């Protein structure tokens, strides 16, 4: 996976742009990582595209120029591999996370609908539950599977407020527009004054963030260098500081 130093230096001299498509829940962390990468690679600019993982793969399939893909689950990266959108030999897990059930924490909403656990979502008082769209948002798929495993999906499904990304769920919670919602632990930590975690939700599969170089990367050498940087201590420190679990070797 190592990029040629000569290729990287050539890209720097040309003022190259490396395009990174990253899952929405990684947005804030990836912006900081991108800044650190740019400081270490003078002349290179990172263009960050943040959206739901499924949307990112759709964009690639439609021909969007991407150098590195970072998804929020293995299944989405598996799909990208099947469609030959990424180089499977470069695939690495860069971080982990946890799914949580959260509620609004603003004073004017606290206590209106008592939600203390997953089971409370089945009570009549709970009318609006935000989750990411399971077809494109990995956190939404994790949430649906957790509700199904708890025998709550049939009850909760009519109350669901669908979201285009996990960050949109967070916005709904922060504004008190829903009674509860499923986000990642790191998302809830970004809004401690407005969002409160009530339960870490067991998931059928670990929440992992795989990354890979795009098969048609416009800047393949820089793409490999950026992926290497994601696994380096400076980038991992950023991810740890924002609550992500360590990368898996």
Annotated model-derived regions:
Residues 4-41, 45-54, 58-62, 71-74, ...:
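Exported/periplasmic ABC-transporter solute-binding proteins
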